[in-house]
């Protein structure tokens, strides 16, 4: 589903849109790679800067007799809360929830949930600072 005032710039790759839910007032800037096979919810007032990847799938590697490339994929939903800014070049991995009023710093790799009212950055992403209420 798609809310109001959703701006998707040229050069954005979107896959499995039937599994993606957009809120209102969302901007997705050029060269983003967004796939929703595992389920993706982007709430309202979200800005996704250029060159961000959002992935809801991953490779498993449990069958040692099969190349990793051919092991089954896993699927986990990603949730991006209200009032979130995801800065350029960030990677949001499957199974992550970014809670309300959060900032993901440029170049971060988010592999765990992001607390509300906070800034996360780094590889892997860690809490940098709580935002003042």
Protein language model regions, located:
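Flexible, glycine/small-residue-enriched loop-and-beta-strand segment within the central core
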Residues: 11-22, 27-97, 123-124, 131-132
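C-terminal/domain-terminus segments
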Residues: 97-121, 125
């Amino acid at each position: 589903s798609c809310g109001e005032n959703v701006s998707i710039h040229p050069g954005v790759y979107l896959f499995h849109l039937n599994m993606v839910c957009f809120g209102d007032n969302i901007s997705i800037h050029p060269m983003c790679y967004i796939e929703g096979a595992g389920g993706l919810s982007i709430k309202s007032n979200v800005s996704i800067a250029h060159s961000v990847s959002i992935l809801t799938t991953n490779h498993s590697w449990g069958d040692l007799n099969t190349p990793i490339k051919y092991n089954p994929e896993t699927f986990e939903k990603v949730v991006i809360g209200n009032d979130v800014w995801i800065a350029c070049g960030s990677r949001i991995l499957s199974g992550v929830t970014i809670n309300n009023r959060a900032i993901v710093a440029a170049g971060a790799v988010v592999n765990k949930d992001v607390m509300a009212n906070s800034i996360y950055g780094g590889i892997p992403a860690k809490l940098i600072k709580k935002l003042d209420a």
